[in-house]
C-alpha cells in the first residue's frame, strides 16, 4: 500500500536509488497504490554520472510492496520492501535490468517488458 510521502527502493539500473511518492495515478483523488499501479515520484538518492539525477520528477510502476497481495486462488504474497521501476511516458522501463523478484500482477496490467527483464516472477 503506497501513498503520498512513501519512500521506495528502485529495482532497476536507471541510476536512482530511492524515490519519494508524490502522487498515485488513477482516479481523481486516489489515496493508495498497489503492485502494478503507476506513481509520480521524486528521486531522493541517485548514483553519480547517470541519466537520472537527484530531485528529478519521474514516473514509476510499483513492483513490490510490504502490504500482502491477496490472489483469487486464496494465496497471499508479501515482499520485504517497497520497490518501483522507473518508466518513460510510453510505459517502457528506463533501465535495462530489473533487480529482485516482481509480482505476477504486473503481467495482467500490461507491463510485460518489466516481467521479462525480472530474474524471478512470484
Swiss-Prot record:
It holds the Pfam family Ribosomal_L14. One of its GO terms (cellular component) is cytosolic large ribosomal subunit. One of its GO terms (biological process) is translation. One of its GO terms (molecular function) is large ribosomal subunit rRNA binding. Part of the 50S ribosomal subunit. Forms a cluster with proteins L3 and L19. In the 70S ribosome, L14 and L19 interact and together make contacts with the 16S rRNA in bridges B5 and B8. Belongs to the universal ribosomal protein uL14 family. This is Large ribosomal subunit protein uL14.
Amino acid at each position: 500500500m503506497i501513498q503520498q510521502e512513501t519512500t521506495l527502493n528502485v529495482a532497476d539500473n536507471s541510476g536512482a536509488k530511492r524515490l519519494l511518492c508524490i502522487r498515485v495515478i488513477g482516479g481523481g483523488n486516489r489515496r493508495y497504490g498497489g503492485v502494478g499501479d503507476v506513481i509520480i515520484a521524486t528521486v531522493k538518492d541517485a548514483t553519480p554520472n547517470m541519466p537520472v539525477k537527484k530531485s528529478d520528477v519521474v514516473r514509476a510502476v510499483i513492483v513490490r510492496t510490504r502490504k500482502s497481495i491477496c490472489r483469487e486462488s486464496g494465496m497471499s504474497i508479501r515482499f520485504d520492501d517497497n520497490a518501483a521501476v522507473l518508466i518513460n511516458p510510453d510505459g517502457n522501463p528506463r533501465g535495462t535490468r530489473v533487480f529482485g523478484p516482481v509480482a505476477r500482477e504486473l503481467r495482467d496490467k500490461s507491463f510485460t517488458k518489466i516481467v521479462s527483464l525480472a530474474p524471478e516472477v512470484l
